[in-house]
From Swiss-Prot:
The lineage of its organism: Viruses, Monodnaviria, Shotokuvirae, Cossaviricota, Quintoviricetes. Residues 1-80 are annotated as: Disordered. It comes from Bovine parvovirus 1 (BPV-1). Residues 15-33, 43-58 have a biased composition (Basic and acidic residues). The keyword Glycosyltransferase does not apply. This is Non-structural protein NP-1. InterPro entries: Bocavirus_NP1.
Length: 213
């Protein structure tokens, strides 16, 4: 049989319960104050994460609008200046009057890219038109086009690798690679990377072919 508690015991228990409740309430208030001081939401007086994000987005948009416009103008100005090896080497040759033919890693990598673009616009396009029926081509025909492209790429890369690996020390490679490395060292590191369109690449390919004739 459970013993009934005396008034003293009952009062003592109530005091402890009240003390524990007060302590818990103080801890809760302390944590709330700490959270408010650290929370970016409460620090701005916002009620929700969404409203705070909206505030931050508006501030970012307003503060970044003018710098972004300047960057856009700078980007436009940068794109007007071409920095392909062909342009850089042509300008250097005009100033230095050197009679060395274009060569080197940067030159040949540009030639390969130009040749690939030229092959798509000319060689493969003509092959497709000759094989297509009602403007369509089955998988066998597509495979023939792909192998045609592969044959060209294999030949180009094989010749370039032979030149660099087994062709011996090339004075032209050393000279023109050094020219382009010096050019890259002087280019603004914060400028926007130049984007070359397919038509511009085709023009570069034609210019490269004309320079080699």
């Amino acid at each position: 049989m459970e013993r009934s508690r005396s008034p003293r015991e009952t009062g003592s228990t109530s005091s402890r319960d009240k003390s524990d409740a007060d302590w818990s309430e103080r801890r809760r208030e302390e944590r709330t104050r700490t959270w408010k001081s650290r929370s970016p939401i409460r620090a701005h007086g916002e009620r929700s994460w969404g409203s705070w994000r909206s505030r931050e987005k508006n501030q970012s948009s307003s503060t970044a609008s003018r710098p972004y416009q300047k960057a856009t103008r700078k980007e436009t100005a940068t794109k007007k200046t071409k920095h392909t090896p062909f342009n850089v080497f042509s300008a250097h040759r005009a100033l230095s009057k050197t009679d060395l033919q274009f060569c080197g890693f940067y030159w040949h990598s540009t030639r390969l890219a130009s040749k690939g673009t030229n092959e798509i616009f000319n060689g493969l396009k003509q092959s497709f038109q000759s094989k297509a029926i009602d403007g369509k081509l089955d998988w066998e025909g597509v495979g023939e086009l792909l192998f045609e492209q592969k044959k060209c790429l294999d030949t180009w890369y094989r010749n370039m690798m032979y030149h660099f690996a087994l062709g011996g020390d090339c004075e032209k490679c050393n000279y023109w690679d050094d020219v382009y490395k010096k050019h890259l060292a002087n280019v603004d590191t914060y400028s926007v990377a130049e984007e070359i369109t397919d038509s511009e690449m085709l023009e570069a390919a034609e210019a490269v072919d004309a320079a080699n004739q």
